[in-house]
Amino acid sequence: MEARYNFKEIEPKWQRRWEASDLYRVTEDPDKPKFYCLEMFPYPSGNLHMGHVRNYSIGDVVARVKRMRGYNVLHPMGWDAFGLPAENAAIHRGIPPAEWTWSNIANMRRQLHAMGISYDWDREVATCHPNYYRWTQWLFLQMYKHGLAYRKKAAVNWCPSCATVLANEQVVDGACERCHTPVMRKDLEQWFFRITDYADRLLEDLKKLPGWPDKVKIMQENWIGKSSGAEVVFRVEGSGEEIPVFTTRPDTLYGVTYLVLAPEHPLVEKLTAGTPYEGPVEEFVQAARYLSALDRTATEKEKEGLFTGAYAINPVNNERVPIWIANYVLMEYGTGAVMGVPAHDQRDFEFARKYDLPVKVVIRPASSELPAGELAAAYVEDGIMVNSGPFNGLPNREGIQKVTEYLESIGRGRARVNYRLRDWLISRQRYWGAPIPMIYCDQCGIVPVPEEDLPVILPEGVEFRPTGESPLTYCPEFVNTTCPRCGGPARRETDTMDTFVCSSWYFLRYTSPHSQDRAFERDKVDYWMNVDQYIGGVEHAILHLMYARFFTKALHDFGLVGVEEPFQNLLTQGMVLKDGSKMSKSKGNIVSPEEIINRYGADTARLFILFAAPPERDLEWSDQGVEGCYRFLNRVWRLVGSYADAVRRAGGSLEIRSHADRELWRLLHATIKKVTEDVEERFNFNTAISAIMELVNGCYRYQDTVPEEEQNLVLMGEVLRKLVTLLAPFAPHITEELWQGLGGQESVHRESWPQYDPEALVEEEITLVIQINGKVKDRMQVPAGLAREKIEELVLNRDKVAALLAGQQVVKVIVVPDKLVNVVARRAS
């Protein structure tokens, strides 16, 4: 071994060897238990950031440990490669999106190789490659065939200045992030997936995921937003129109003093046409188009409304109820109409107070009256129904069911379950995405592209114009085609799919990435799925994870996969911070992984990122912490180097010859136990590394305190080999070199994970704490497992204890074996 730890030579050397030997390539093996370890694949932005390093280092430790424990491990990597930044590069730099993307992929692949992550690169996928998006398109057609894909008008974010559609992420404080023009809502024909058909299953099956963090499951529950209640039908006075309203509180129906419609509600125009209210209402509707859904529903946002001049009839008491429009009601939720019950809903109360609308109490506390004129806030607790006709005196919870039954009996309502979850809008007016494989024919209508004609290839040389339509619209060789049914002239769909569609099935493609005739091979999917451990940021808790679950359930129903949940266990790692803030260019606090690797090596970077904090917590970057990890690896290098030649030459069988031998042997097995449990059961990589550091300290202690001629080289060889094996998943390059130095022939990563010996953990001696009247006075070494009577005898006969007890009478002696003795004494009378 070289005297100096030279990571600049060691790391590239072993990366080349791993690649040449296909060390991490994997195939199906029915004789081994399988383990599918997956980190969320990245968008190829061009460079890895520290969040990537953390994510992939965590996954790599899990994958490497599982391999060493005898599992057949699938650990793939790929690229979520479609998306808006590539189009921005085309617009601002004149670089074609494909060229920009593939260049970024090449650079990030190089950086991942430099990190030493144990990926099976033979399974690499990129969602922008025709071999991949051909099957994304095929899956869209399966959704369409089964009635889960459909087209309808929907509102999108529209920037009038750029004349383009914006994604939600591009709307900042209600304005376009590029030009700061206020963004408005505009209706366009869009494609949707019917994810709401799966709302109940998506909700219920969260119970089947004990390996997911509770916070993620709660976020999904809230996003699905299941609520039970009633749909109440209000008739519009003087017309045949009806307004269905969903409410979770039918018990408050007698307290309705107004109705509110969303500004986009189709009835608004009908109700106001030709009336004095038409102009002001139209102005209000236009103003609402410049507010995002988030702005309109924010609790701190002022609620604005306007009377339409129309009235509805309350079905339970036939009272006239004024119909308003308001900015806080969304067409996307429920029916786009809500009933105003100001006495029992705080938002309604504030709206009624602002516009001087009546307040009618219909629920009072069980033990007191509740005059409407004295209300300072809405009464939202349970109570007794009042002013509610035949339901007076009922507990309101009972009234919910009774009022619903009454509505059903008169044909003016029904029990209903509502969801916050909306169908998934997948259309994007973008170029750099998977083209939606549909054709429009004047004779035949909407026609799917035949499966044998896939993929619908993205054309090159497209012009990017800020028109609000996909750039594909202005590419006649793409748009103009023939109808597959009648052979007449037809037009291709020019929208592309939301990039979340591509990432909703990539974990299936990894199981058979080279398949030419299908999206994935069923036998291989059945072997590898579910993903045993999925790792990624909590920011993906809702959209990506929800969509992937939906896709898997739909494909299961189509008979294409055998599982209903894609990810058995989920780890959401925290962010990497610097100076207390998330790393970002704007804050000037970015630390480049490449710079750290060039200065300290990949093993140091990995070790620090795993050691600095538990994975689920945010990690504060520390230059001193990186230096400390680098010094530790140098200590390990020197330790192994100082023994390598001697332990290779040492012969004979292992014997424990001294107390020092016994302590080192015990420490080794305690470390194996601790590291195994921390990595496999708790993902406490930081405490696992800490235990390895303690073992290194123990080895140095042995080296420093045991005379050289008395040192047990067979034992030290065994300890160092186990030490290197334990460290290997965390620091894979240096451990290969150390393993070779200790005489290893194969890769250390082919070694079996060490097993601890329970008998080796038994301590020969323990330190016994001695208390007198509960206060620690002394300590002594005694043989482990000593009987209570013997412990009591040794303590009471100890000189220091006898002196402390002089003049006192021993009342009793409390013995906690192998831990402490408490002598209870009082002054002798």
UniProtKB/Swiss-Prot annotation:
Motif ('HIGH' region): 42-52
Reactions accelerated catalytically: tRNA(Leu) + L-leucine + ATP = L-leucyl-tRNA(Leu) + AMP + diphosphate
GO annotations of cellular component type: cytosol
GO molecular function, one term: aminoacyl-tRNA deacylase activity
Residues noted as binding ATP in the record, renumbered to the chain: K585
Residues spanned by motif 'KMSKS' region: 582-586
Subcellular location: Cytoplasm
Record bears the keyword DNA-binding: no
InterPro entries in the record: aa-tRNA-synth_I_CS, aa-tRNA-synth_Ia, Leu-tRNA-ligase, Leu_tRNA-synth_edit, M/V/L/I-tRNA-synth_anticd-bd, Methionyl/Leucyl_tRNA_Synth, Rossmann-like_a/b/a_fold, tRNAsynth_Ia_anticodon-bd
UniProt GO BP: leucyl-tRNA aminoacylation
One Pfam family cited in the UniProt record for this chain: Anticodon_1
Keywords annotated in UniProt: Aminoacyl-tRNA synthetase, ATP-binding, Cytoplasm, Ligase, Nucleotide-binding, Protein biosynthesis
Enzyme class: ligase
Domain of life where this protein originates: Bacteria
EC code(s) of this entry: 6.1.1.4
Gene3D superfamilies reported in the protein's UniProt record: 3.10.20.590, HUPs, Isoleucyl-tRNA Synthetase, Domain 1
Family: Belongs to the class-I aminoacyl-tRNA synthetase family.
PANTHER family (alphabetical): LEUCINE--TRNA LIGASE, MITOCHONDRIAL, LEUCYL-TRNA SYNTHETASE
Protein name: Leucine--tRNA ligase
Organism field: Moorella thermoacetica (strain ATCC 39073 / JCM 9320)
Gene designation: leuS
